[in-house]
């Protein structure tokens, strides 16, 4: 047998060659970075959105990151974009006065005045509007500004079950032997922020007010910041009438608010300056009226009358000490004045007698002297 001829594959048709070539070119073009590697240094590649040409669009990306950090869509409600180091920051520049003209925000929180509300809206970038003038009287909040789940307002979390109506975040423990309302309020994570409540007691923070309201199943509101003092009139610390309360539409109150004003008795606004002549003016929003806390020794609607009954009141130990010291100093001063007056009155007659004797001696004439001789 002769030599075997080598096998030869049939020649591919021209159309198949073109198809293979097109697939290879398309695959090479779609490889990541293949387009960027063929670009010359200094440009040629279109950046996303047709905003310029660069190798990797780094400059544009940097600018876009700054814009995304602070622009009109992310810095609203009175905020201003300002440079902060290498980037931009949304700054809320509100110079709020400290007058107590409380307003109720749409998030259920009470703010010291409308400026504080706008500043909170800017800081949290949330739409907060004024829904009522004066503090919020919510069904499940006491105006403490700690969130919609907190507070001791009337009718908060009423649950009707075997326990009866459980209010103020109390829950019915039906599995217990003694079925009743229990309070599972944990105040361990709250910082020390003493407040004076409407029951005349001081609490370490607003959370303990809610806990006491839950345990006692009665409404206890926060009157003012700080411990209760002797000047707090317990007659003014009564409970608010449920009929006077207002429940605004709550949008979002999950954040802590440091701009929230606490209490239902506030100092009067500037337009009521001089309302109390001898006392402190307080505005009670539950009645929408101003009242006066008169100083010691004064009475009347505007503290304009002198209270003479104060003369018969036994002062405290500290005040009694001051009274005794003042009495001793006054007695010493009176004694000194009396002594000076007595000395003057005693010396004057002697001087007068001496002057008269001298005058009489001067009246001797020459005739009287010759007679004596």
UniProtKB/Swiss-Prot annotation:
SUPFAM superfamilies: EGF/Laminin, Kazal-type serine protease inhibitors. It is a single-pass type I membrane protein. Residues 37-323 are extracellular. It comes from the Eukaryota. GO terms for cellular component: plasma membrane. Its main location: membrane. One of its GO terms (biological process) is host-mediated suppression of symbiont invasion. Disulfide bonds join 92-122, 96-115, 104-136, 183-214, 187-207, 196-228, 268-281, 276-292, 294-303. Residues 264-304 form the EGF-like domain. The chain crosses the membrane at residues 324-344. Residues 359-373 have a biased composition (Polar residues). InterPro entries: EGF-like_dom (IPR000742), Kazal_dom (IPR002350), Kazal_dom_sf (IPR036058). It is found in: Cell membrane. Glycans are attached at residues 56, 140. Residues 1-36 form the signal peptide. May interact with ST14. Neuron-specific restriction factor that prevents herpes simplex virus 1 (HHV-1) infection in the brain by blocking viral entry. Also able to restrict herpes simplex virus 2 (HHV-2) infection, although to a lesser extent. Acts by preventing the association between the viral glycoprotein D (gD) and its cell surface receptor NECTIN1, thereby inhibiting fusion of the virus and the cell membrane. Also able to prevent the association between the viral glycoprotein B (gB) and MYH9/NMMHC-IIA and MYH10/NMMHC-IIB receptors. Belongs to the tomoregulin family. This is Tomoregulin-1. The lineage of its organism: Eukaryota, Metazoa, Chordata, Craniata, Vertebrata.
